[in-house]
Regions:
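C-terminal accessory/binding modules appended to enzymatic or scaffolding proteins
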Residues: 294, 300-313, 317-366, 371-373, ...
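Feature captures the catalytic cores and cofactor-binding loops of soluble hydro-lyases/lyases
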Residues: 344-434
Length: 434
């Protein structure tokens, strides 16, 4: 039977009272279902698959950090704080930028990257006004390559259908990232390290079923971002492209079948003879007041899959399927406006666009940085102060917009206005330099 009920303790208990199940599977209900584990366990309801104790070990920061330390697996330094002064002290001790987020976060909700004391104060004022009960986590933000692994384990062996690499660097929610399988810039030695770490974590957490692990590579070292003791949104994607029925295998493992008897082997699964790219789909044309800048907070509402003989073909198919316009018009113009942190990096991107025949337009500070090395660029006024930006969009002279900005409220309003007009006109607005 199928029930359409909210995942609240009382509603779930009513269903259990009617159905009288032998146990409950929480691994396929996302983070909301995982948060019910302690409650169900305290009521004597058997948890099928990974135990409540193991789930708590993966979710509890101190216990999980102790596990990582035992295996000498790196993680970005961080602290849990409850007040404004503690947050500022932690941020300055760790060094900016830092990642701020509530404990037990869902979908990256209320997660931000802060670059200075003022941004920490602004964030903590919002969080503290909501009367938080759990600590706010302050983590050192490391900008590196991000990877994601879905693992099936029976407690003795593990099967890793595939390792996915994000095109965007860390700091963008995994649901909003473009994910590529197999990874496109990871060497065999690092790939083996990822497999070894995944096996250690899955087995030491006594996983029975699915577990999702997110990694980053920073300065040649592997770091664990987080471990989710459940199925992730990438399970349908990786199942489709590898041919491994992950949900079916995980369910069989949860009820006691050994992984080796299921016919898909153990360890890292064989690579297919093609490349698969997962591209997020956004709904900003309907959610007009949303801030479209990619961040640790998830904003996508769907995803599409592109397959190709190589990464370029798969990415092209994925972008077109997601609704992006990827051809040049007769004018072939690109509007660029980036914050100070991104200005050194935009120079090489602008040079490549210039070599491809695009006409470049940029706001004052960005234009100065681009022209410093001799790239031709036409200066337009700042957002919110010069209508020329919108005139260029309306005239059809802009094919793409590259836009990254500060977290100042005034700037965000201008950003939302510009992004919404781009969506209305069908002009791709890129908010991440990757």
């Amino acid at each position: 039977r199928l029930y359409f009920e909210p995942l609240f303790p009382e509603d779930v208990m009513h269903i259990i009272a009617v159905e009288k199940p032998v146990g409950v599977v929480v691994a396929f209900g996302g983070q909301t279902a995982i948060k019910l584990t302690k409650f169900l366990d305290s009521r004597g309801i058997p948890i099928l698959g990974t135990s409540a104790e193991s789930i708590d070990m993966a979710e509890d920061r101190e216990r999980f950090d102790a596990l990582l330390e035992r295996f000498s697996i790196k993680r970005a330094a961080g602290r849990g704080v409850l007040g404004m002064n503690e947050a500022l002290e932690a941020a300055n001790e760790l060094g900016y930028p830092v990642l701020l987020r509530p404990s037990y976060v869902i979908g990256g909700q209320n997660m931000v990257i802060a670059h200075n004391d003022e941004e920490v104060r602004r964030y903590m004022e919002i969080i503290l006004s909501g009367k938080i009960e759990n600590p706010v986590l302050v983590d050192q933000y490391l900008m590196g390559k991000e990877l994601e692994v879905d693992v099936i384990s029976d407690g003795t062996d593990v099967l890793i259908p595939g390792v996915m690499q994000h095109i965007e660097r860390t700091g963008v929610h995994s649901g909003d990232s473009i994910a590529v399988y197999p990874p496109f810039s990871i060497g065999d030695k690092m790939l083996q390290t990822i497999v070894d770490c995944s096996e250690k974590l899955a087995l030491s957490l006594k996983t029975r079923g699915l577990i999702n692990i997110q990694y980053l590579i920073y300065q040649g070292e592997l770091y664990v971002i987080e471990v989710n003791p459940r199925a992730s949104r990438t399970v349908p994607y990786i199942s489709k492209v590898t041919g491994v029925p992950m949900v079916d295998l995980a369910t069989r493992v949860m009820v006691g079948q050994p992984l080796k008897a299921l016919g898909y082997g153990t360890g890292l699964y064989k690579r297919p003879p093609y490349v698969a790219v997962k591209v997020p789909v956004f709904s900003f044309e309907k959610i007009t007041d949303a801030n479209a800048a990619l961040s640790p907070e998830m904003k996508s509402t769907g995803e599409v899959l592109g397959l190709g003989a190589n990464m370029q073909e798969a990415l092209f198919k994925g972008l077109v399927s997601a609704g992006y316009k990827v051809e040049k018009s007769g004018h072939a113009g690109v509007l660029i406006s980036v914050n100070r942190r991104d200005q050194p990096e935009i120079v090489n991107i602008a040079r490549k666009l210039d070599e491809m025949g695009f006409r470049l337009y940029a706001t004052d500070g960005t234009a100065r940085e681009i022209s410093r090395l001799g790239t031709d660029v036409e200066v337009v006024g700042k957002l919110g102060r010069d209508n020329r930006v919108f005139q260029l969009l309306e005239s059809g002279r802009i094919d793409y917009v590259i836009l990254t900005g500060s977290t100042e409220p005034e700037y965000i309003r201008d950003f939302i206005h510009l992004n919404h007009r781009c969506v209305q006109l069908g002009i791709p607005c890129l908010t991440s330099l990757d």
